[in-house]
């Protein structure tokens, strides 16, 4: 087989090199390697000085790079050699070459194969016929006839078939016009990502047929004109003009529309437009039409900078027919950090505001994709929060303003939290103290404001200081940590208290002693080796009694009774109550650890408080705690294998012999797209909980193909895969389903279909039901009917996995010729 390097090929200097001469073949290989790494040919020539010339400077050295430079500079690309070969090569040097039989032309990342080819050197023009194939950076074109200027990549291809590397999309056309290296126009074209088989009767599940498709590799965007989208051989959507991605890069344009039908808004059509402003800025504008309510406009703007980032959202609906008024909402999120000579500074803003008290009920599902009884409190409390932080060394400052918007329901009013206008906090935490001591000082000033019609108590300015000193004694086998705290609080009220005073003060010390031991032994259970620990712990705390019944409550509540709070000094969270404790908490935990990795396979724990005197300090309306023995906390967690998980917490009252609170959860996740979880939650009436509840929660995602023996993870060309997915929340107390999300997913090689039924509780007496459909054409677009089921599944189903996770772009050498 003949091989003819043309004038664009590497030029080998004829003079003798400075060092011992290299054989021509080795020299050519070295020059080619340098050229591929981006070294200009002019530099290569200079690197070969004459024998008589002294070297003026050291030869160029290669620089390390994290990746191979695929896009060469124009000057380098112009000097790339052209190589041709075939069964028979004829022609004139520097003019033209004719290759017959297995003809091949190579230049850079472009390779042309054909039965016959003619190459004109002066015009850099290749004409090929018969089984023509172009491979350019992994993108392949096949056809009958080609006329191409190789470097400029301009010309045409007749009767072409094509396949693109990044999306695995392919199709055919009567003609492909190459406009330049990055742009082309495909005429009478088809486009699909369905995997082609060798069967003569093969037809793709979906295909786009268009009069023209413009392909832009700079923007990675395809634009189809005068087209129609076919699914299963049936035209489903006429497309006068549409853009679609040629890679995973973001692009401006219309996003797939969303069509919905629910019991509140009626039929809903939303058409989002995505604006890719810059690599670090984008916006989404979504006009929406609702048959029962009118039109709405939603906007979202995001930005990201090295020192700050944020998000702005706004929604507006003029004359909502549901409430006969304008509806609006906006949100601002901003986070920033700055380095200054005086220390680090941070800024945070989180503001949410809506037009009226019914907004959470009328818009919560459309905006967030989720609503429910457990979510309502958060949706009804909208923050207006701004914080400014400063830190340097051992000191830090915080300045904060927080103003809530509380959305009230006349049938279920809630007490709004207090606004903090403003709050100023200083903390001092020395890093090194003599004698192994740890110490800190925290001082806070807050002005609390709220509507007295709801709170029933005066507003106030509160100042407090808390100083503490501890001395940890640490050893591998255990620890002892004595701690002393001093709390000082002062109030100034805007109205007199019941005793007629407008001020109040309180100063209290607290002493605590925390201690624990750690025993270890080798153990073996169920044929498996473990390192077993036994960790007894004792925690004693004492705070003297001080009458605090007249002090209002601004930011304080009873701590939840759990393994985290049982070993703390105060039974209350916040600064308005300090419990008069004289108690000892005893507990023990045992763990089974993997001796090689340290992973926890099992954990069992028990803890109980022993009270030596009554706790007289309570929340308003509360009763003193006089039980000498508290409820017993029992906890267990088992992760015997990564596939299985079990967790349980029980609050047991030894006096009544009954459990006041029980939580049991289990999970089985043997592989991708396979997970089942179940939970049981029971809560009796306690001093903290006024409404009992008992619920069962089940969630799952599982391929139905497993039922008939098809246990793969991905679909094949022989058929797709069915998945069942959902979550059920059932109230045993009310004997009804509270929340329901159930659906089916079907994954083919090139499309995904989803149907989801969602029924979520809006209030104690009402719910909203939605039926959602979606078909996703892989590598092209996604069409939804009934809002977005993906959002609902991700937010409601524990450990839900998208059927098509993002993957890295394949190398162009996966389709190398």
From Swiss-Prot:
Compartment(s) where it occurs, according to its Swiss-Prot or TrEMBL record: Cell outer membrane
GO CC terms in record: cell outer membrane; transporter complex
Coiled coil: none
Keywords: Cell outer membrane, Membrane, Signal
GO annotation terms (biological process): Gram-negative-bacterium-type cell outer membrane assembly; lipopolysaccharide transport
Membrane spanning residue stretches: none
Keyword Signal: yes
Record's function text: Together with LptE, is involved in the assembly of lipopolysaccharide (LPS) at the surface of the outer membrane.
UniProt protein name: LPS-assembly protein LptD
Gene: lptD
